[in-house]
Amino acid sequence: MKQQATFSMLAKTFKGLEEVLAQELITLGANEVQLERRAVSFRGDKALLYRANLCLRTALRILVPIASFKAKDTDALYNQLRKINWSAYMQSSTTFAIDATVYSETFRNSRFVTYRVKDAIADYWMEKENQRPSVSTREPDLLINIHIGNEQVTVSLDSSGESLHKRGYRVATTEAPISEVLAAGMLLMAGWNGQSDLYDPMCGSGTFLIEAALIARNIAPGVFRSAYAFEKWPDFDADLWSNIYNDDSHERDFTHKIYGSDASFYAIQQAAKNIKAAGVQKDIELKQIRMEEIKWSNDAINGQMVNALVMLNPPYGERLHSNKEMEDLYSAIGSTLKHQFAGSTAWIISSNAAAMKCIGLKPSKKYHLLNGELDCQFNKYDLFAGKRNESIIHSGF
């Protein structure tokens, strides 16, 4: 078999997930893996590009850099862009779109940068074939990414298209659902690999539950997506992609159970729809119940000890909740964890630092993550088994 050429790539992610993403890439077989700002750079071949899009749980998109240069102004930017051999990546009939990210005192207007990039590409093709390619913001054949830091410009091709957090299984939603990429990253940070039961007592539309099931069974998160941008590239290898997409040899059995509950019946309905769309119904049980009403025991169930991993993304109080409501809610969370989940481990994310103190448990680990634009604490709590009320029974599910 002919060995494929290798090239540089960049996987974008959320702040705080860089190390998790780097480990994912190493596991996939990537070389020259290096942490960047909200990204990880690496090197690999076309097969790795396809696998990265399909298999990475904590990547938002995979970029392939094609040019890097310095530009002091928009004229210099235009001239450098004209020098790129665009015919290697597109034709004059190719529709394209531009995504520009600018951190620069020189280039303050990202929209004007986008116009200059468009002009440079259009003028390249006018000179070459007397034909201008069309810009299309909806389903373009080629998505071009421009990153400018001060005067350093990097031009990349976006191999993903829609953000990779859009797995394809979310058919229903609730208010402010957590990103699939962030949920998967948090699960991996918590050490989840399907080794125990897992419980999300505020499951919303089921993101933690589904991502946990996919990790437990080692199902690639991208199998539900209908399309990737690289499928429209001139050098797309349909046979290679088909082999990678249809390879389920790394999937595994999952012998434990994933539980989700929520105070809202509507949320449980929405979660059930998403779980069905992801095809993981047999791994997940749902129940409508308030946090403070939950009963859980570490007694043997079906001959197995239940030492659950508990994942919680409670309300942060950003939407009209009073401080008293938040304090009471987080206090109830702490009480339930302490009395119902002794012997288990809980991880909680929240941007409400004051409310987090009301949990009343000392975190054994603390991380900082971004949930959207909100700076959040992501804390681990070891729920040590101590004296418990003998009346506690496993009645939660």
Question: Language-model segments: which ranges?
Answer:
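Non-catalytic nucleic-acid substrate-recognition regions in nucleic-acid-modifying enzymes
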Residues: 2-140, 396-397
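Flexible, glycine-/basic-rich loop-and-beta segments that form/coincide
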Residues: 51, 56, 162-167, 171-172, ...
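A short, flexible beta-alpha/helix-coil linker loop
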Residues: 103-106, 163, 315-319
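C-terminal edge-of-domain segments
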Residues: 144-160, 379
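SAM-dependent Rossmann-like transferase core, predominantly class I methyltransferases
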Residues: 155-189
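Conserved S-adenosyl-L-methionine
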Residues: 178-296, 325
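C-terminal catalytic and target-recognition region of SAM-dependent MTase-like enzymes
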Residues: 289-397
